[in-house]
Amino acid sequence: MKIVDLAAMEYAEAFALQERLAADVAAGRAEETLLLLEHPPVYTLGRRGDGGSLPDPSVRPVEINRGGDVTWHGPGQLVGYPILDLGCRGRDLHRYLRFLEQVLMDAAASLGVQAWRVAGRTGIWTEGGKLASIGVGVRRWVTMHGFALNICNDLAPFSRIHPCGIVGCPVTTLSREAGRAITVAEAKAAVAAPFAGLPADALPEQPRDAVQPSSCDDVHAPSTTSRRPPCPLTV
């Protein structure tokens, strides 16, 4: 698999590149590719979004063909677009989403931050809030779009939306959770490694103990701490 570091790129340009690569991978003209980059500030709205997650009427998101609701991209946030052929990996979109979550949890752990899944949600969380968002699209079983991992970005833009359609859910960054400055370059290295070693015909099995129960009222890790859980699951 090819890992391509694009540094910074406008959203429309990156989307056009994804479309070209996805078509080429589906036709056997190109190898699978992971695009890693940052975007200038932009809001995007996936297929699940209906405007209810946009309490600020001045927000004008780019409507795109990925799953999920509304989110924000900007400097200091690592965006990853894997262009993968799921046709030779079991055609299991659910397993692919869990694979992306595991990659991000492992990357966060390597940088000193514990993160976890929440049943019924897609993405990863910490005690401080949502750390990464995931939204994908598939054409001819080739993936597009992917994940956005908050590293050291400004969190103020998230206050103008209900991130991923979740009302009242705080958003956090790796740097905030680690209590130190983490760079996008550090995160790129941690995220890229699992893709570089990905088998051509399978997705790894995912552990089951990283998922918190869907019946919980909050997305927080089990612990003895008395801190107030940060993120009510209200939609």
UniProtKB/Swiss-Prot annotation:
CDD domains: LipB. It is found in: Cytoplasm. Substrate binds at R66, G67, G68, D69, V70, T71, W72, H73, S133, I134, G135, G146, F147, A148. The keyword Cytoplasm applies. Residues 202-235 are annotated as: Disordered. Keywords: Acyltransferase, Cytoplasm, Transferase. In the reaction, the free carboxyl group of octanoic acid is attached via an amide linkage to the epsilon-amino group of a specific lysine residue of lipoyl domains of lipoate-dependent enzymes. HAMAP family: LipB. Belongs to the LipB family. This is Octanoyltransferase. It comes from Geobacter sulfurreducens (strain ATCC 51573 / DSM 12127 / PCA).
